[in-house]
């Protein structure tokens, strides 16, 4: 996955692609978010990357960062909510153990060592 960093490399890598299909390659941006960004900014789905200017690129970059941060905050808030209500997965997060049913007898030794040191 790529990151959206530089205008020149983005345009040179995706010259013949549509803006929407070029944005799909960026980390943290999926088709649903791209469609939302297109509605907010008034993008044309069939506009080529080669016809894009720097102002449009910087606007897309700001929107992509905004949507990526929203998703990141949502995940963080969900984990904190589970910790707060102390359900099973929340307790596993608090104890720094595997959450999704992974094996702990032979794996996940490092977190369990750290827990023993704290106690």
Swiss-Prot record:
Provide the function of this protein.
Located at the top of the head of the small subunit, it contacts several helices of the small subunit rRNA.
User: What quaternary arrangement does the UniProt entry report?
Assistant: Part of the small ribosomal subunit.
Q: Which is one Pfam family of this protein?
A: Ribosomal_S13
> Which terms under GO biological process does the entry name?
translation
Give the record's family classification: Belongs to the universal ribosomal protein uS13 family.
Q: What does the UniProt keyword field contain?
A: Mitochondrion, Ribonucleoprotein, Ribosomal protein, RNA-binding, rRNA-binding
The scientific name of the source species is: Acanthamoeba castellanii
Recorded GO MF terms: rRNA binding; structural constituent of ribosome
Q: Which SUPFAM superfamilies match?
A: S13-like H2TH domain
The listed locations are: Mitochondrion
- Kindly provide the name given to this protein in its UniProt entry: Small ribosomal subunit protein uS13m
Q: Which Gene3D superfamilies does this one have?
A: 30s ribosomal protein s13, domain 2 (4.10.910.10)
Please name the PROSITE patterns in this protein's record: RIBOSOMAL_S13_1, RIBOSOMAL_S13_2
Q: Which GO terms describe its cellular component?
A: mitochondrion; ribonucleoprotein complex; ribosome
